[in-house]
A protein has these predicted regions:
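Short, aromatic-enriched amphipathic alpha-helices that serve as compact interaction elements
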Residues: 22-39
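Selective detector of the "anchor" transmembrane alpha-helix that sits immediately C-terminal
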Residues: 122-146
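Short, aromatic-rich amphipathic segments at membrane interfaces
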Residues: 102-126
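Alpha-helical transmembrane segments and their helix-start/interface "positive-inside/aromatic belt" motifs
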Residues: 159-176, 314-318
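Terminal transmembrane helical module of multi-pass membrane proteins
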Residues: 288-340
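Short solvent-exposed beta->alpha transition segments
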Residues: 26, 41-83
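Hydrophobic secretory-pathway targeting helix
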Residues: 1-22
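Interfacial/capping segments of alpha-helical transmembrane domains
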Residues: 182-206
């Protein structure tokens, strides 16, 4: 069964015709009206019904025109046009934000509801980045001493040596899934490119796009905050509390997806090699978190108690946070200096 897009195509073509006669604010306003009425976004059912050849295009459109959240209220009378996009104030319940319509050549490329406050001011500022840079240097120097930071670091390394078979096994499994995803992208480049666009759009929604042009220090703060809170704490260490298995499953799917979307099949080899250290370091931090969850499970199986296992999980979280900080610094320099 072919993917049913006749109405969608009509709307896009109408947008193109509007562009010749109307300003960008009016083009965006009319598009948002159609979007809120449910006449633009494909449903998941329609995506799942699409054929193999149609799936990349279906996913790309789903990511570009996601269904609006239920209860979203948009002030269409106060558009703000700047730099290829039109912003409308919006609310979702008590949560503030804005609907952003991205235009290119008079055509609506994508639309999204961007929530306010996903990145706190500290995580977008030069002061926040400078603090993290100085703290990172202090942290690295302190590891050579005898203080708490050094003691925790040595205990974490001792655990890695003690359980090296489990640690190496997790590295082989998770890095292997990342490599497998990269290879699969060579077989399905169209689908991989659609997934890549979806991941890129998700990063824009959290505010990282706004920080890209503010310099290395704000980038450092934003990247580290997001990777630490969302990547390590919420999706690795917190699931790791439930006997480690949820964290392992989440990261297994994440590594396969990241490999698929960030494959050299899609990215020029020089850029891929430049970004590879970031990928390896960030993924290593999440491997450490998954390893901590596995140690928690192993402690219970050995009847050593949940508290012992929890301590080991937190030690791995400490080590992962250290790795993430230096990964964020490298990525901030990479994006803020070399890729500008």
């Amino acid at each position: 069964m072919r993917f049913p897009w006749p109405l969608f195509v009509v709307l896009v073509q109408a947008g193109l015709s509007f562009a010749s006669a109307l300003g960008p604010e009016e083009v965006a306003r009319r598009f948002v009206e159609e979007w809120l009425a449910g006449r633009v976004s494909p449903s998941l059912e329609e995506v799942f019904r699409s054929s193999k050849d149609e799936l990349p295009q279906a996913l790309e459109r789903l990511f570009a025109y996601p269904p609006p959240p239920k209860g979203l209220r948009v002030n269409l009378d106060a558009p703000l046009w700047e730099g290829g996009r039109v912003r409308f104030p919006a609310t979702l319940g008590e949560e503030g934000g804005e609907v952003v319509v991205y235009l290119e050549g008079g055509r609506v490329e994508r639309v999204a509801f961007v929530r306010k406050g996903l990145l706190p001011p500290f995580a977008q500022s030069e002061a926040g980045g400078l603090f993290l840079l100085l703290f990172g240097v202090y942290w690295a120097v302190a590891l050579r001493g005898k203080g708490v930071l050094a003691q925790l670091f040595r205990e974490a390394l001792a655990l890695l040596r003690q359980e090296r078979r489990l640690y190496l096994g997790l590295n082989l499994l998770l890095y292997g899934l990342f490599a497998l995803g990269s290879l699969l992208a060579f077989l399905e480049p169209g689908l991989a490119r659609s997934v890549q666009k979806g991941i890129g759009g998700a990063l824009e929604l959290i505010g990282l796009e706004e920080v890209l042009f503010r310099g290395v220090l704000p980038l450092l703060a934003a990247i580290y905050y997001w990777n630490l809170t969302q990547g390590l704490l919420l999706t690795t260490l917190l699931p790791g509390l439930f006997l480690g298995l949820p964290a392992l499953l989440l990261n297994a799917s994440r590594y396969l997806l990241f490999g698929f979307a960030l494959s050299p099949a899609l990215i020029p080899l020089p850029l891929y090699l430049l970004h590879l250290p970031t990928l390896l370091l960030e993924l290593q931090a999440y491997i450490l978190g998954s390893f901590g969850g596995a140690l928690l499970l192993k402690s219970l199986l050995r009847r050593e108690g949940y508290r012992v296992g929890l301590g080991r999980l937190l030690l791995m979280g400490y080590l992962g946070a250290f790795v993430l900080l230096w990964a964020a610094l490298y990525e901030a320099v990479e994006v803020g200096v070399f890729l500008r």
